[in-house]
Every structure is written in structure tokens, then in C-alpha cells.
Amino acid sequence: MFLACGDALYDVFPGDSASSGQITLNATVGGSPLNVAIGMARLGLKTGYLTANSKDVLGQKLAKHLESNGVSTQFLAPSDLNTSLAMIALNEQGHPSYSFYLEGCADVSLSKEQCPEPSQFKAISLGSYSTVVQPCASTLAWFANEAKTSALIAYDPNIRPSIQPDRAVWQATVEKLGSIAHVMKLSDEDIAFLAPDSSIAEYAQSCLQLGPRWVFVTQGGEGSQVFGQNGEHFSVAAPKIDVKDTVGAGDTFQAA
């Protein structure tokens, strides 16, 4: 079985209303690792999802959404805390900006006691804000380290400065989880935040020095690159398409 673990929230898109004092809200199940889990399941892989999931109505619907997409919910740890929310605004190019409501919420409360036996998994994917918000961050780092000898560990930082604006926290997390992971995936935006004075190739090489076998870098409309521990380098151009929004694009790449 494959496992993704971490965020469990709703992406909330505010819309216009006929009244200036009202807005419409369109909420969609989200969370970067959760999107990865659904992507893997849609590719035909037996997949589970690990998170602390709220017992509230949003958490119940989130679990049903996972089930309807073929993702096992046996690793969802029930929580009395609320479901996290992300308010999303899209610019003219379809790129999102985020405002998160996470404090005291279920997904970031995951504890070691709620984690399954790691030896049952072939591969484990983790990343995003759940790796920097405590106590979940420490839990996932511990879990990945426990699993690294029996499962492939894939890590995507998926930087969210609006949640944790301190660059040093993200850098320390990348160093810690990069030393555990067998595969890393970053976006060009992640690299620009983590190392603004480095090129993509320079930063990818610094990540390889942490220990992963492969480092993948996505660049939106510019395509993607992969760097290998033995000096390999490949690049793939992106097809030309009409973009409505880019939410979840990197997660889809990670799942594949």
C-alpha cells in the first residue's frame, strides 16, 4: 500500500454577490498531501491517507470524499478539533494566494500514537504545512524516519509563507526531511523562497547532498527538471494549454 500523510482542509473560494455586504463561498476538499493521495488512487495504486480528521461535518464529508476517490480512510485518526480552512484568491493568471485558518485544528494535531505501523507501506509521501506546524511536524518527521528503511519516502515542501513566514524554519525542515527522503519534489517558487540567491540547478545539487536519490523541480509553464545523485539531469517542456487555475498542479505531479 502507498500512503500520503499531512494536511486535511477545505479550500474556500470567495465569490461575488448581488449585495455589497455579502459574498458567496465555494468550498472544496483540499490539502496538498490529500490531493497526492487521490492522485495515486486514480492511477490505480492501493492508497491510504494519514491525518487527524475532525468529527465535524466538514471532516465527515472529507472522509467520504476520500472513500469516493478510492482512498482508504482506515488511517484517519478521529479528532474533536475543527477542520482547517484555506481561503483562496486567484489572480488573472489563475495563480492562487492563500489565507489559512489552522490554529487548534485537527490535521495539525496528529500525534505519534495515531500513526500506523510503517512497515506495511511501499511508499510514503509527505509535505506542505503539516511538516512545519506543531505537533504534527514532529510526528511526521518521526514517522518518516521510522519508515525510511522499509518504504520509499517522497517529500514535497510545498512552501506556504502565509502559514510560517520564517524562512529559517522551512530551511531547517527541508534539511531534516531531505536527509530522510529518497525523492524530493520542489517548485521553482519553493526554491525562490528557500534560496533566493541560488539557481534551480544549484539548489537541486544542495538538496542531493542531503541524501535523496532524485530531486524533481516543477516550473509551471516552463515544464520540469529532474536531477540525480549520479549526475543525471533531464528536462521536460510543459504542453501549451489554457489555464483556469493552478491549484493542485504540483500535487498531481507528485502523485504521478
PLM regions and their residue ranges:
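Structural alpha-helical scaffold elements that stabilize or flank donor/cofactor-binding regions
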Residues: 2, 116-117, 176-177, 208
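Conserved phosphate-binding/catalytic region of the ribokinase-like
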Residues: 1-3, 21, 146, 196-256
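Conserved beta-alpha-beta core of the PfkB/ribokinase-like small-molecule kinase fold
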Residues: 129-206, 222-223
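Structural motif
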Residues: 1-3, 122-123, 183
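Glycine-rich phosphate/adenosyl-contacting loop at the front of the ribokinase-like
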Residues: 1-72, 243-244
